[in-house]
Design a protein with these regions (language model features):
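A generic structural signal for short coil/turn motifs at secondary-structure boundaries
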Residues: 1-2, 151
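Conserved glycine-rich beta-strand-loop-beta hairpin in the small C-terminal domain of fold type I
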Residues: 185
Length: 224
């Protein structure tokens, strides 16, 4: 649920092609996963790994991706200072195959299309909230997104996940969601009472930081 397969693919390609552009890395990693491995995935994980930062990705019908950075580097530093304090990630301990969840979404195509249209509209509202520094609204929109996401698949959530989600809302979370395909993995919450939420949740807390640069090659030795 943390984009590990996309990050792994981008990292391997960057090791093979150390001078490659982020665009090449993202496109090639996506092509390998979709066309060669036949995984029913999107493009966001590969592009996030290649480019870094917080971006809006607009995917055209022909597969071309337009990338719009949310902030300049100076603005980015101010943004992540808030988000890294107010976004809290927990591991549910529940594991699932992302392909299994994504397959059920494809089988429910009509419902899936409707929720994706709603999610697309929500994306621009989220962008505006972050641009304007309306962080609480951002948290509320996370909750709205989770309500749409649950409609995509009958195995997106389960009673245990729903119980943890409600517990978080009762202990300072404004909104949240399962990240990734769903069905398990990690829960991400926005809160203005970080310590209260961490103390209340019976799950492993995973600290994290944002990255602005994307995939990098670390040179170690004269022959690289």
């Amino acid at each position: 649920g943390l984009g590990s397969s996309g990050s792994f693919g981008v990292g391997i390609l960057h090791a093979i092609y150390p001078n490659a552009t982020p665009e090449f890395l993202a496109k090639e990693a996506t092509r390998i996963q979709m066309d060669i491995l036949n995984n029913p995935i999107g493009v966001q994980d590969q592009y996030a790994a290649a480019y870094g930062g917080i971006n809006v990705y607009e995917v055209n019908k022909n597969g071309e991706v337009k990338i719009s950075p949310l902030k300049s580097y100076a603005e980015w530093l101010r943004l992540i200072d808030v988000l890294e304090q107010r976004l809290v990630l927990f591991f549910t301990g529940l594991k699932r195959e992302a392909n299994e969840v994504l397959k059920t979404q494809k089988e429910n195509a009509e419902q899936m299309e409707e929720t994706l249209h709603n999610t697309q509209k929500l994306c621009y509202n989220i962008k505006n909230a972050l641009d304007e520094g309306e962080f609480r609204k951002f948290g509320e929109l996370m909750n709205e997104h989770w309500q749409y996401k649950k409609q995509r698949s009958p195995i997106m959530t389960n009673p245990q996940i729903d119980e943890w989600y409600e517990l978080a809302l009762k202990n300072g979370a404004v909104g949240g969601k399962l990240v990734g395909a769903g069905g398990g993995g990690f829960l991400l919450f926005y809160t203005e009472d970080r310590e209260r939420l961490i103390k209340a949740m019976p799950l492993q807390h995973l600290p994290f930081k944002f990255d602005y640069e994307g995939s990098k090659v670390l040179l170690n030795g004269p022959h690289l």
